[in-house]
Amino acid sequence: MMFNNENYKDYDQELWEAIQAEEDRQEHNIELIASENMVSKAVMQAQGSVLTNKYAEGYPSKRYYGGTEYVDIVESLAIERAKKLFGAAYANVQPHSGSQANAAAYMALINAGDTVLGMDLAAGGHLTHGSPVNFSGKTYQFVGYTVDKETEKLDYAAILKQAKAVQPKLIVAGASAYSRKIDFEQFRFIADQVGAYLMVDMAHIAGLVAAGLHQNPVPYAHIVTSTTHKTLRGPRGGLLLTNDEAIARKMNAAIFPGLQGGPLEHVIAAKAVAFKEALDPAFTDYARAVIANTAAMAEVFAKDDRFRLISGGTDNHLFLVDVTKVIENGKLAQALLDEVNITLNKNAIPFETLSPFKTSGIRIGCAAITSRGMGVDESRTIAHLIIKTLVNHQQPEILEEVRYEVRRLTDAFPLYKKN
């Protein structure tokens, strides 16, 4: 029977209204969640293509189904572009997410119960870097490294000392809430000193790496994992890279048949579009603007003694702010800013004293506002609006002023221009 529901707006009004409301929210909110970005219409078009109909277990030219000659072309394009973008010999574009990419990397390199040294969640790590509530912490024996208590930056000498003490089989470098550059060459040196593998999770900084604005981990790590959204500005998904042929075979087997069945070829097509966009010289300009906007916004907080900028600054697309001098915790700050249409997230800070459900800090990222075309002036304005909201959170008339200014900014920089 043929479909008679070509227009989902008419067929499923409930769903259409929810999606329309989300479109309006994105259009009229200032998005500062560091793990979010705004993709191009080309990325969305590829993801919404007929490729969603096709099952394709296996890899290009080695499928378990017929009729895959065209998805082979699509996936091969994505693979070759990813390799070129990051200077890698091998790439796997099938992971459905960064978490699954990390799981595959672990499966490829180590065994259940092995000791792993990874960044502590409170210091800026990710759930998949050994949190006890995550599969990583349940499957492997993770030991967390942290940052220096005074500088709030990575202390490579201390990490080396810790690595020698615990003798891990794997060291994980990379973070989800660390605002400074990470020296992957130093991490490889540490790994070699103890005979460990090095895995780098570059999910947050992949776009900056692609643009040549952060050290590329591929020459140093045994495996590099990433998401394809965040600063890379692609669809939500994962990526694996390596220069080692034997490890490439293991990581491919870990994804399929180890963790996943059929790949999402429509998402892989969208990844291919995003990789092509990132190979364009204009993407480097975008990444430079992200860093400049983040630095400009962070500087406003650094100059206000009512707030504390974690580590004193930022080198990438995000930074953390301790807000406890002006408001009880990060959870309340997040909720208040939601009320004025500024979206960010509460976040633990190094050596956190509050519950992870409350936190002392907030995390701010500038990738999404940069995608809208906002610059350093707008970034400073947004920082002042955040401060104005948190300092005057008990004054409704002030909050209304902030809402007006937020709407003025979003109207001036529309997300997707209407045809």
Swiss-Prot record:
Compartments, as annotated in UniProt: Cytoplasm
Record keywords, A-Z: Amino-acid biosynthesis, Cytoplasm, One-carbon metabolism, Pyridoxal phosphate, Transferase
GO cellular component: cytosol
Superkingdom: Bacteria
Molecular function GO labels: glycine hydroxymethyltransferase activity; pyridoxal phosphate binding
UniProt function note: Catalyzes the reversible interconversion of serine and glycine with tetrahydrofolate (THF) serving as the one-carbon carrier. This reaction serves as the major source of one-carbon groups required for the biosynthesis of purines, thymidylate, methionine, and other important biomolecules. Also exhibits THF-independent aldolase activity toward beta-hydroxyamino acids, producing glycine and aldehydes, via a retro-aldol mechanism.
Protein name: Serine hydroxymethyltransferase
The organism of origin for this protein: Streptococcus equi subsp. zooepidemicus (strain MGCS10565)
